[in-house]
């Protein structure tokens, strides 16, 4: 990019130099045509000047209104047209205005934070400078009109001198243009020697400026010498005029004294006649001398008036030229000040641009480091999270498989328990039917016993002793039955404890499902043993009941007296059996309720496990979604990195474009300053021509 920028800058500089040379050639041609042209009368300059002022006042540019230098020049022109006395007061005002302008310019220097708006306002500033240049050109046209008036007055006497001076100036400018064109071609061909060519060009311009300054100084010295000689001539003429005036007065006084002396002296007639003749002749001589002196006096007065008028005109012209030179010098000083300010601002802008570019490069490098670090950190974190998620997914899948196996086992155990409960319920129904049959048989037997009661009463007395023994045996049997019932209760309590253990083990399926299975197996064995014991007990009871029935049938036939006791005993036995059956039913119901509770708890646990499974699946899906989001974020980070790179490239391009704009503005300012210098040189040349014209006028006078 750097060589392309340098080539663009060189091309722009070449184009600016071409435009400057073209403008210089145009100004020289215009000056030559102005000097060669003829104007009919000096009065035409005043209306032209008024028209130019009116046009400037009617068609002001917006940037010119904002310029203080332009407003000062306009006020000076208005002051010139209104009154000549105000011109003497104008320099101090201009100096004060120039000081205010410089103070305002120094106070309005931008800071570092206003760099971007100043760069944006450079185009407006260039338009403003162009407007000032245009106004200076208009002022030059006005000056040219004034110079044209002077040239028209002295055209007949100094035509040859003007032609020679014009030819010399044209030769000098054409020589300068040819050298500049050669240098421009050398710049285009040899871009590497741009600095040396510019230095040589500046050196040549400085030499030409020094030559022009020498010429201007010589012309000013000659004009000053002419003014001094004219002043001396005027003083001599005034002295001669005074001397002639005194002589005339003296002669008049002598003539008056002679006339009065002749009248007073008394003479004779002859002497008086002789004196009268002499007096007439002498009076004629005196009258002639007086008339001659009066004529000389009138001529001298006319010459003096003309000299005074020419002196006043020369003074006025000198004062106008002085004011114009002063204005041009002030404008040149303002232009130099603006140039220095612009150069300082441009250097400041260049430094700020370099600083901003370095700062942006540093920020870009730091941001790239941060982005790379963040990318590496995000990659490491994403890898760690992926590994953790894979581990959690594997562990969760293992847990889900284990829980599925546990659920299958729980369902199998539940099905087996349900089948066992159904079998127990069937057995209980069978036992109830058997007990109902036994009760019916016992009732039938009781009815038969009641029928045989009367017969048994007879045998009661005989069998009372036997019944006592049998009662003792029955009590022993009741005690045995109580012991058996306590054993059954203990077994039931053990079964309840085993069920509680099984419930606790079912609650802790993850810790000891195998233990619960063993305990369930043990409880099944105990339950089967208890059922077998119950069946054996029932069989034993039925056998005992049958045996007792047989004994009762044998004893009832023999002992009617013992019938009531046996009935009571049988009622007690029936009540005990009913209570036992009820207790067994209650225990069966409690066992069924406990089994249902266990089933419900197992179902609740299964539901909890299913919910946990769903929750784990949801968490796994969330983790998967998070992994996908992390991957998308990684992709977005990469895209953001690309966008940041593009943005940084755009910023670099913008900085380069802004630097190019600044270079263009600098070249434009340089061009405008060169135009101002050319305009000042034109002013100096015109002033020198004016002084030369005045000198020739004075010499002609």
Swiss-Prot record:
Disordered: annotated span: 1-67, 84-114, 364-387
Highest rank taxon of the organism: Eukaryota
Record has Endoplasmic reticulum as a keyword: no
Coiled coil: 119-173, 203-258, 323-695
Subcellular location per the Swiss-Prot or TrEMBL entry: Cytoplasm, Cytoskeleton, Microtubule organizing center, Centrosome, Centriole; Cytoplasm, Cytoskeleton, Microtubule organizing center, Centrosome; Cytoplasm, Cytoskeleton, Cilium basal body; Cell junction
Keyword tags: Cell junction, Cell projection, Cilium biogenesis/degradation, Coiled coil, Cytoplasm, Cytoskeleton
InterPro entries reported in the protein's UniProt record: SDCCAG8
Free-text function comment from the UniProt entry: Plays a role in the establishment of cell polarity and epithelial lumen formation. Also plays an essential role in ciliogenesis and subsequent Hedgehog signaling pathway that requires the presence of intact primary cilia for pathway activation. Mechanistically, interacts with and mediates RABEP2 centrosomal localization which is critical for ciliogenesis.
Entry protein name: Serologically defined colon cancer antigen 8 homolog
